[in-house]
Regions:
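Short, charged beta-turn/beta-strand-edge "cap" motif at the junction between a beta-strand
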Residues: 63-68
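A basic, amphipathic helix-loop patch mediating RNA/tRNA/ribosome contacts
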Residues: 13-52
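A detector for short, charged/polar N-terminal pre-domain segments
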Residues: 1-10
Length: 70
């Protein structure tokens, strides 16, 4: 599944983006999945829930991915 998420601000944090894309149900779920090293941003494992995502960034979680767009 590939999804685009739109954000109005300059950036969106990784945990928020995962929730907005529907890949996790809560912030707690996002935190656990990110800390487990199961999320990649632009092809690299990311373990910071507060990582700022900008338009063009691609996030993947176990075969699902989304792209941040303005």
């Amino acid at each position: 599944m590939e999804v685009e998420i739109r954000q109005e601000d300059e950036f969106i944090k990784l945990g928020q983006a995962l929730k907005k894309a529907g890949l996790v149900d809560s912030g707690v779920d996002a935190k656990m999945i990110i800390q487990d090293g199961r999320v990649t941003v632009n092809g690299e494992i990311e373990e910071r829930r507060g990582r700022k995502l900008y338009p063009g960034d691609v996030v993947s979680l176990e075969g699902d991915s989304f792209k941040v767009v303005k």
